[in-house]
């Protein structure tokens, strides 16, 4: 609600209000520098902000950050993983942080590593991984504690078409089970096909948000986005 974030004199995000409901895939669209990453980092508690309030299922990120962080997972646009660890060790490390029991974590690691076809790679150091493999590992780590809200910054960058298709299915599964997804993207075709709702941000201000039908009407999302960007 009414989020404002400044860097010195520069306002990166101004009076932004969004409501993400359970069961929704919510896309966040804007050009580079529009304020997408700043908004996401504020929601997950990485950045402090000047004005407004952020609540995750009733808990304030400022007043009760631990309770909030247990309910969410965040994948940044360039995940900073512990390169000296093997993929498997890293996933167990994340599972330890969130208190995931041994049986559940093994089940989830097996399920998602098999889906992404990186099971054999988990024994190798993360330093040897390609960008796409690191992205897959970050996705599995985000899913490992079954969070209520998953927040992702450009999650499809670096993924091959098959992995992108798998991730879309995983996102829909989260929402079908009562969770929610909020992700930024500049791939408008993905947003149009995948999202229940979208928000468009320009120069730190929310300029349009709602269901896909409300935002784009009879036009395609790309036309609406380019028109709004040009105003």
Regions inferred by a protein language model and the residue ranges of each:
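Conserved ABC transporter NBD signature motif
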Residues: 52-63, 67-68
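Conserved ABC ATPase "signature" region
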Residues: 92, 96, 103-121
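Catalytic Walker B motif of ABC-type/P-loop ATPase nucleotide-binding domains
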Residues: 150-154
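ABC ATPase "signature
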Residues: 209-210
């Amino acid at each position: 609600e009414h989020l404002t974030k400044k860097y010195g004199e520069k306002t990166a995000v101004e009076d932004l209000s969004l409501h993400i409901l359970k069961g929704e895939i919510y896309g966040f669209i804007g050009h580079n520098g529009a304020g997408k990453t700043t908004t996401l980092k504020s929601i997950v508690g990485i950045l402090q902000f000047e004005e407004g309030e952020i609540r995750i299922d009733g808990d304030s990120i400022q007043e009760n950050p631990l309770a909030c962080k247990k309910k969410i997972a965040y994948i940044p646009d360039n995940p900073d993983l512990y390169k000296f660890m093997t993929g498997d060790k890293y996933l167990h490390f994340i599972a330890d942080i969130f208190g995931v029991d041994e049986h559940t974590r093994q089940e989830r690691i097996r399920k998602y590593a098999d889906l992404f076809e990186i099971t054999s790679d988990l024994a190798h150091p993360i330093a040897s991984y390609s960008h796409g493999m690191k992205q897959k590992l970050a996705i599995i780590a985000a899913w490992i504690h079954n969070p209520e809200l998953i927040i992702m910054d450009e999650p499809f960058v670096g993924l091959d078409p098959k992995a992108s298709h798998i991730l879309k299915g995983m996102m829909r599964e989260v929402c079908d089970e009562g969770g929610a997804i909020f992700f930024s993207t500049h791939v408008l075709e993905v947003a149009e096909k995948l999202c229940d709702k979208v928000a468009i941000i320009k120069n730190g201000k929310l300029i349009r948000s709602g269901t896909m039908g409300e935002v784009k009407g009879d036009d395609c999302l790309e036309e609406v986005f380019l028109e709004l960007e040009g105003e």
